[in-house]
Amino acid sequence: MVSIYVPLIYITILMGSMYGVSRFVRKSKNQESKPVSEEWFGENYSRNIFFSLLQQNPPAEDTLLKAALVLRATEGLRRLMKLKVSRMALNNLLNRGGVGDELIRKFGRLEKETELELMDIAKTANSLQPGWNQFIFQTCNEIIENEKIHSIIDNIPKDIDSISQRWQTEKILYEAADEELRIQAQKELGVL
């Protein structure tokens, strides 16, 4: 004899599993709607700053908008350079069968997002000052190269300390080996 609790338990389990599946599907759809660039690179603060300046009331000065746009374009170029390097590694992994279709699809979406971002930057630059879209990326590339040079220069004092310490230890080892060879040569000559 089947009690009244069996169908109730069955319905409860069925409803709970349906709720779990629907929640999982909604969660995965929400993740896909989020920009892929935020997953890979994190939040784009320079873009957020530019749009907040653009929507300010009263409007921000042109020079401030241009500076924010240069920062946004610089960040876009940095991301593009990272993508180019990552594309080579991804192709290598793809040839070996080390990555799945999901990653390839996300990477393709990321490249499209970055291209659209750079095209939007070029259009915005042209709207701020006609013809500026031709020069903004050259300026941003120079900024990136300048930052690389500054990071190398900033690391020189750290490198000097490590090189100096290494040289001191090598100098002591060299002097000890030289002293040992000198003593051995004197023994062979009969001086000692």
From Swiss-Prot:
- Protein name from the UniProt record: Translocation protein sec66
Residue intervals annotated with topology Lumenal = 1-3
Q: One of this protein's Pfam families, by short name? A: Sec66
- Function of the protein: Acts as a component of the Sec62/63 complex which is involved in SRP-independent post-translational translocation across the endoplasmic reticulum (ER) and functions together with the Sec61 complex and bip1 in a channel-forming translocon complex. A cycle of assembly and disassembly of Sec62/63 complex from sec61 may govern the activity of the translocon. sec66 is required to attach or retain sec72 in the sec63 complex.
Q: Which residues carry this modification: Phosphoserine?
A: 162
The GO annotation for biological process reads: post-translational protein targeting to membrane, translocation
Cell division among the record's keywords?
Answer: no
Keywords per UniProt: Endoplasmic reticulum, Membrane, Phosphoprotein, Protein transport, Signal-anchor, Transmembrane, Transmembrane helix, Transport
Superkingdom: Eukaryota
Q: Which gene encodes it?
A: sec66
GO CC annotation, single: Sec62/Sec63 complex
Location(s), subcellular: Endoplasmic reticulum membrane
**Main localisation:** endoplasmic reticulum
Species of provenance:
Schizosaccharomyces pombe (strain 972 / ATCC 24843) (Fission yeast)
**Quaternary context:** Component of the heterotetrameric Sec62/63complex composed of sec62, sec63, sec66 and sec72. The Sec62/63 complex associates with the Sec61 complex to form the Sec complex.
* Cytoplasmic-facing ranges: 22-192
Q: Which residues cross the membrane?
A: 4-21
Q: What kind of membrane protein is this, topologically? A: Single-pass type II membrane protein
